[in-house]
């Protein structure tokens, strides 16, 4: 039901495009996590790779790099690590990551404190693992998946690959504040500090 020609542009570029009605019957909810959850439901390969749509620095080989660590059978999640550009400078981006996600993860999940880009949108999951996890509705989805994989499989099941410098649209603070609130809520919820956040249930057993 795209109104901005996203589906048509993707199909023209050679992507397989499926309507949500053909994947799951539930009425779609707004939010990034909803799209990723449905993507997992539609996937048929052993590995599912996610790449943010506003990425301006995608390079050939990026998807391959994200999947290579899965030669180790213990690896369940692969996160990209990179430098975040900001206003023309090679570093300084990722403000929600640096000011919200990382401090909270170090406080409540110190075993994840070394993860370079906990909120990064470029990552890969084993499909069987993804189907066993809930997906937070909105921008907290990456934090939720990171914590859930670590709790189920251990932090050693999370690998990182260096993808250089990431360039994408830098949002104004007025847009980042709600994102930071959702990310903080997800981490605090997983830590048992506050109640549950809105999320889709695991797909295992549903399809």
Task: Indicate where each model-derived feature is located.
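Conserved catalytic loops of nucleotide-sugar-dependent glycosyltransferases that act on lipid-linked
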Residues: 92-186
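Active-site acidic Asp-centered loop
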Residues: 51-54
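Short, high-confidence coil segments that cap the C-terminus of an alpha-helix
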Residues: 45, 73-76, 155
